[in-house]
């Protein structure tokens, strides 16, 4: 029943846990969190930067991500990728999301069944070998896995153009999700017209 505790009591509990685990515990705080939450974070930043920070920490054995689902999933993916597991002798780093109800409307714009349906429908009229799927980092791990299975790429807002250039060097078409606006605006900036960007 932590929800019934006052902030001072919560802070004391968190500090006790931090003292117990020392540098093995990394607490990440996303920019959007309240000041009281950020004050207890070891690192503050955007979702990708925070995930990279935790994954590169040689002492880290536990991650608490004070953010939303896709952020914790991204930290899990980066911290537990094969080369990191090998460095730690196969030991996985658990990632804790303190508020399991913390979601992101952007990440919720596309569910895996919708992406698979769209891909199948595209396959009825096009050769999907000529389509590179690109997902924005603000997406569920299942969408990132889909992209990986189909030879695609995960992008951030700062490297979306580079991701599209990489994709178009491989195939003549791109399937971009879940943020249609990031995809369209980036493509427009590359000289691709709106009539060349159908929406599903």
Regions found by a protein language model. Give the residues of each.
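Active-site loop-to-helix "anion-binding N-cap" substructures in soluble metabolic enzymes
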Residues: 1-200
């Amino acid at each position: 029943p932590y929800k019934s505790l006052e902030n001072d009591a919560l802070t004391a509990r968190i500090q006790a846990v931090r003292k117990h685990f020392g540098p093995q515990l990394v607490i990440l705080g996303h920019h959007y969190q309240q000041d009281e939450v950020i004050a207890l974070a070891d690192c503050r930043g955007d979702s990708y930067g925070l995930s990279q920070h935790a994954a590169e920490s040689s002492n880290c054995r536990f991650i608490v991500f004070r953010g939303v689902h896709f952020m914790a999933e991204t930290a899990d993916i980066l911290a537990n990728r094969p080369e990191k597991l090998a460095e730690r002798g196969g030991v996985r780093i658990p990632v804790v999301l303190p508020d399991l109800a913390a979601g992101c409307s952007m990440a919720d714009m596309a569910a895996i069944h919708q992406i698979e349906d769209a891909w199948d429908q595209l396959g009825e009229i096009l050769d999907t070998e000529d389509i590179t799927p690109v997902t924005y980092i603000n997406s569920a791990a299942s969408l990132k896995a889909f992209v990986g299975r189909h030879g695609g790429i995960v992008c951030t807002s700062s490297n979306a153009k580079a991701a599209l250039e990489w994709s178009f060097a491989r195939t003549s078409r791109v399937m971009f999700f879940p943020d249609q606006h990031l995809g369209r605006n980036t493509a427009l900036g590359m000289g691709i017209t709106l009539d060349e960007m159908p929406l599903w």
